[in-house]
């Protein structure tokens, strides 16, 4: 097989992303493939500003922030055993996984 696999992880909780990346790296290294990463990608922050009051007091506002954390993992010289191990791997439900071969 021996192809490059790129895995992108995305979540709103940085602990989930880090634990999932560590789990993937451990699994891939156990199969004998070469791993590059996890590489932290820039954090995307969305800030929402809303009025505290519904009618008056425009100067009184509140801000909310939604941060998304991303990690990138590259796998080189993968085998069929590596792909099978990745398919059987269970990750938390709050993590979005994108795999490119």
From Swiss-Prot:
Q: Name one Pfam family in it.
A: Ribosomal_S10
The protein in question is named: Small ribosomal subunit protein uS10
What SMART domains would the database entry show?
Answer: Ribosomal_S10 (SM01403)
InterPro entries, alphabetically? Ribosomal_uS10, Ribosomal_uS10_CS, Ribosomal_uS10_dom, Ribosomal_uS10_dom_sf
What family does the database annotate? Belongs to the universal ribosomal protein uS10 family.
What job does this protein perform?
Answer: Involved in the binding of tRNA to the ribosomes.
List the GO cellular component terms.
ribonucleoprotein complex; ribosome
Q: What NCBIfam families does the record point to?
A: PRK00596.1, rpsJ_bact
Read off the HAMAP family from this record. Answer: Ribosomal_uS10
Molecular function terms, GO-annotated: structural constituent of ribosome; tRNA binding
Keyword Ribosomal protein tagged = yes
Please give the subunit comment from the record: Part of the 30S ribosomal subunit.
Give the matching PROSITE patterns.
RIBOSOMAL_S10
Give the record's keywords alphabetically: Ribonucleoprotein, Ribosomal protein
Query: Could you give a single Gene Ontology term from the biological process aspect?
Result: translation
Q: Which gene encodes it?
A: rpsJ
């Amino acid at each position: 097989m021996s192809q490059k696999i790129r895995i992108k992880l995305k979540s709103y909780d940085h602990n989930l992303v880090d634990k999932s990346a560590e789990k993937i790296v451990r699994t891939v290294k156990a199969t004998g493939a070469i791993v590059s990463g996890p590489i932290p990608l820039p954090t995307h922050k969305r800030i929402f500003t809303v009025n505290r009051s519904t009618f008056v007091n425009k100067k009184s506002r509140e801000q909310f922030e939604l941060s998304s954390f991303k990690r990138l993992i590259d796998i080189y010289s993968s085998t069929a055993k590596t792909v099978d191990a990745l398919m059987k791997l269970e990750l938390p439900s709050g993590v979005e996984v994108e795999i490119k071969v």
